[in-house]
Amino acid sequence: MATPRRAQLDDKTDITGARVVIVEARFYDDIQDALLEGAKTELDAAGVAYDILSVPGALEIPAAIAIALDAAKKNGRPYEGAVALGCVIRGDTIHFEIVSAESARGLMDLSVSRSLALGNGIITVNNTEQAWERARADDLNKGGDAARAAIQMIRIKRKLAKP
């Protein structure tokens, strides 16, 4: 495995009051617990409030985010961002390719069409060992990476919104 390099982002744009929705696919509970913990740790450290919604699988994540965004806006407590968390492990059929590609496409469509600060933490791997390499509780946790991405995108949105 190549050594990952994380960009050091020094953006200190104020994100006070930021609120995101985490939507997690509970298909692999133990791996999902680790991804969720990584995301929560990063959001808590940044002072970002969050709500958590659980769905059965990765394909349901984009729709659940869209539903959450609409409901939160209607209720007067809109989300500034979202964190998508899940795990898709390759099997013997093309289901892996479909779920991986379509969940990513759905998230990208949401992000672009709604200018949504989105962190994609849906890991797509060949086996359980690779999943744990990306979910373990350290600097490689992809749940934490997804939360950091959403936080940075919120900073960018706020910075560009300033007069």
UniProtKB/Swiss-Prot annotation:
Known pathway: Cofactor biosynthesis; riboflavin biosynthesis; riboflavin from 2-hydroxy-3-oxobutyl phosphate and 5-amino-6-(D-ribitylamino)uracil: step 1/2
Gene Ontology biological process: riboflavin biosynthetic process
Record-listed E.C. numbers: 2.5.1.78
Pfam families associated with the record: DMRL_synthase
InterPro entries: LS, LS/RS, LS/RS_sf
GO molecular function list: 6,7-dimethyl-8-ribityllumazine synthase activity
Record field: catalytic activity: (2S)-2-hydroxy-3-oxobutyl phosphate + 5-amino-6-(D-ribitylamino)uracil = 6,7-dimethyl-8-(1-D-ribityl)lumazine + phosphate + 2 H2O + H(+)
CC per GO annotation: cytosol; riboflavin synthase complex
Gene3D superfamilies assigned: Lumazine/riboflavin synthase (3.40.50.960)
Positions that bind 5-amino-6-(D-ribitylamino)uracil: 27, 58-60, 87-89, 120
Enzyme active site: 95 (proton donor)
Keyword terms of this UniProt record: Riboflavin biosynthesis, Transferase
Binding-site list for (2S)-2-hydroxy-3-oxobutyl phosphate: 92-93, 134
Role this protein plays: Catalyzes the formation of 6,7-dimethyl-8-ribityllumazine by condensation of 5-amino-6-(D-ribitylamino)uracil with 3,4-dihydroxy-2-butanone 4-phosphate. This is the penultimate step in the biosynthesis of riboflavin.
Family: Belongs to the DMRL synthase family.
Protein name: 6,7-dimethyl-8-ribityllumazine synthase
Organism: Afipia carboxidovorans (strain ATCC 49405 / DSM 1227 / KCTC 32145 / OM5)
Taxonomy of the source species: Bacteria, Pseudomonadati, Pseudomonadota, Alphaproteobacteria, Hyphomicrobiales
Gene expressing this chain: ribH
